[in-house]
């Protein structure tokens, strides 16, 4: 079976162009070759090999137990199944927090597995590490707001940036990460007005929202959430695109269309 597509690959340059032109970026998590091919043929721009695999594939209560080798393995699977989408891989907990050198060593492992960018969590305090990686040829996606690897420190899965002080801190984090060279930043569970202000304040870095309103440069959801395969209570920012869809292909195509035309997220998915 060949998964190869004729479409021109999405590059970091193209993502920057999309941001500048106001064209929305559609991202979904992906963990294997079959879904990588499915997401590709339905127009997903970016595949995020997320450490959320700990939750949705392994049944873990958090992302913390996920290992670097597991992330590399799933990256290899996704890359085999796709050719057009840009592939971003999460750096798992404990693989980058110690030092920029540790981050570089482990980012190199993920890049060798096929990642085109690595994602790491944290605000301005991670700027030194981001700069270290970017200067050495590793594109970086930052992640602020609700950062799942810090769930215990944050006291659970809570909206971040509700207070004036919290909103100002998130904006300062985003600006510091942009200055350090991050090309993308995920804004998770952030009030829509705060995410909109952050997006407008940035010069080059694209914002990818998950529970952060419709004004971000793009959107991301966990694949399993988007197709209604999730245990327990559905998060407010999730829409089940399988409802009314004839197939998973149709659901993914509907998600991409809704992101592109700005109809997702709607008000009921925002904080």
UniProtKB/Swiss-Prot annotation:
Localization annotation: Cytoplasm
One of the GO BP terms on file: pantothenate biosynthetic process
Pfam families the record matches: Pantoate_transf
Origin species: Azoarcus sp. (strain BH72)
GO cellular component: cytoplasm
Transmembrane portions of the chain: none
Active site residues per record: 188
Family to which the UniProt record says this protein belongs: Belongs to the PanB family.
Keyword Hydrolase: no
Keywords: Cytoplasm, Magnesium, Metal-binding, Pantothenate biosynthesis, Transferase
The keyword Metal-binding belongs to this UniProt entry's keyword annotation: yes
Top-level lineage group: Bacteria
Record text on cofactor binding: Binds 1 Mg(2+) ion per subunit.
The gene coding this protein: panB
EC number, UniProt record: 2.1.2.11
Chain positions recorded as Mg(2+) binding sites: 51, 90, 121
Protein name: 3-methyl-2-oxobutanoate hydroxymethyltransferase
Purpose of the protein: Catalyzes the reversible reaction in which hydroxymethyl group from 5,10-methylenetetrahydrofolate is transferred onto alpha-ketoisovalerate to form ketopantoate.
Matching NCBIfam families: panB (TIGR00222), PRK00311.1 (NF001452)
């Amino acid at each position: 079976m060949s998964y190869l597509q004729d479409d021109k690959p999405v590059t970091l340059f193209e993502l920057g162009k999309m941001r500048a032109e106001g064209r929305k970026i559609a991202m979904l998590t992906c963990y294997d070759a079959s879904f990588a091919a499915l997401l590709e043929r339905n127009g997903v721009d970016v595949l995020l090999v997320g450490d959320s695999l700990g939750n949705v594939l392994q049944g873990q209560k958090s992302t913390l137990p996920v290992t670097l080798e597991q992330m590399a393995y799933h990256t290899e699977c996704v890359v085999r199944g796709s050719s057009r989408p840009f592939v971003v891989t999460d750096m798992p907990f404990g693989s980058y927090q110690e030092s920029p050198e540790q981050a570089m060593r482990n980012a190199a492992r993920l890049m060798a597995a096929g990642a085109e960018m690595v994602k790491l969590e944290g605000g301005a305090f991670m700027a030194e590490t981001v700069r270290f990686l970017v200067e050495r040829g590793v594109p970086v996606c930052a992640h602020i707001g609700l950062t799942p690897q810090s769930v215990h420190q944050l006291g659970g899965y809570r909206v971040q940036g509700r207070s004036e002080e919290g909103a100002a801190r998130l904006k300062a984090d985003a600006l510091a990460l942009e200055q350090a060279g991050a090309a993308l930043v995920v804004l998770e569970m952030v009030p829509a007005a705060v995410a909109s202000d952050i997006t407008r304040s940035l010069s080059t870095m694209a914002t990818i929202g998950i529970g952060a309103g419709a004004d971000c440069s793009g959107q991301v959801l966990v694949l399993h959430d988007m197709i209604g395969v999730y245990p327990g209570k559905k998060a407010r920012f999730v829409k089940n695109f399988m409802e009314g869809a004839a197939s998973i292909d149709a659901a993914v195509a509907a998600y991409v269309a809704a992101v592109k035309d700005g109809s997702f997220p709607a008000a009921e998915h925002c904080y």
